[in-house]
Structure formats: C-alpha cells, structure tokens
C-alpha cells in the first residue's frame, strides 16, 4: 500500500497513507484504532497524513487490531527483516 490522493467534499485534495486508511476503515474510526494501539487519536491522524511514522510496535498492534487484514509489512515495508512480506521471494 502507498500514499493515495483523496478529494474531499469541498474539492480539497490531500494525501493519505492507504494502509492506515484501510486500518481505520477496518476498525471503524481513528479513535478506535488509537485505542487499540494505546495512542491518542491525533497520532492516528498524523500516521494517516504522513506526518509521523508508525512505530514497529504499533504496526504490529494495527495488524492485530485488524485481525491481519492490514499486515505490519504493508505499514512498515522498510522493516522487512522484522515484518517480511510472505508474497516476496527471499
């Protein structure tokens, strides 16, 4: 997953992290994802908009909160040693 562009109802274009958006959609809200990760909602907003990087610990928490529908390797592909992509050849 990557960064995607979204146009809101006012016609404003903004970028969002597709993996974090999928996680929010999966659990129901930014607040619910924040609760699952033990952080405050503004942190989830910052992850969504690329203002803060999701820690390895929270990437795993997101994977667990979404019952694996948003795996940690999609959230932090740069940590392939920690979160290997099972669909990628070694």
Positions of PLM-derived features:
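Recognition helix of helix-turn-helix/homeodomain-like DNA-binding domains
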Residues: 38-53
């Amino acid at each position: 997953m990557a960064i995607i562009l979204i146009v809101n109802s006012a016609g404003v274009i903004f970028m969002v992290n597709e993996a974090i958006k999928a996680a929010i959609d999966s659990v129901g809200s930014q607040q619910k994802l924040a609760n699952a990760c033990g952080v405050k909602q503004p942190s989830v907003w910052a992850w969504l908009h690329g203002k803060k990087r999701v820690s390895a610990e929270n990437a795993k928490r997101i994977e667990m909160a979404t019952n694996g529908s948003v795996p940690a390797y999609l959230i932090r592909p740069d940590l392939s040693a920690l979160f290997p992509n099972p669909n990628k050849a070694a």
